[in-house]
Design a protein with these regions (language model features):
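Solvent-exposed, well-ordered amphipathic alpha-helical segments
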Residues: 9, 22, 53, 89-92
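The canonical Cys-X-X-Cys-His
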Residues: 21-35, 84, 88
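Gly/Gly-Pro-rich "capping" loops immediately C-terminal to redox-active cysteine motifs
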Residues: 18-22, 26, 38-62
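Axial heme c-ligation environment in periplasmic c-type cytochrome domains
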Residues: 40-48, 62-94
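Bacterial N-terminal signal peptides
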Residues: 1-9
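Bacterial signal peptide processing site
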Residues: 11-14
């Protein structure tokens, strides 16, 4: 089961060009970080998490290059990255 989740998380098929940050998150991130950013296979990204204390450049670098067992998501363009990070920040601020 965990192997399948990791496999699916690593499938960088890329969201549609005009996808919202939430859509990008649900397609590429929620499989490991859960729909509410609470963590699972991957670490918690929600309010009060280590990720919430990092700056946007760190998140962009981590998403683009991967980290540890997290795959890289090189197919995201700068606008998709901005929307994804803005969505994560919005949820972290709730």
């Amino acid at each position: 089961m965990v192997a399948m989740a990791l496999l699916l998380c690593g499938c960088d098929l890329g969201p549609d060009e005009g996808a919202t940050g939430e859509e990008i998150y649900l397609q590429l991130c929620a499989g490991c970080h859960d729909e509410d950013l609470g963590g699972g296979v991957g670490p918690d990204l929600g309010p009060g998490s280590n990720a919430a204390r990092e700056d946007d450049e760190y998140l962009e670098f981590t998403i683009t290059n991967g980290r540890g067992s997290m795959p890289s998501f090189t197919s995201l363009d700068e606008f998709q990255l901005e929307r994804l990070i803005a969505y994560v920040r919005e949820v972290q601020g709730e």
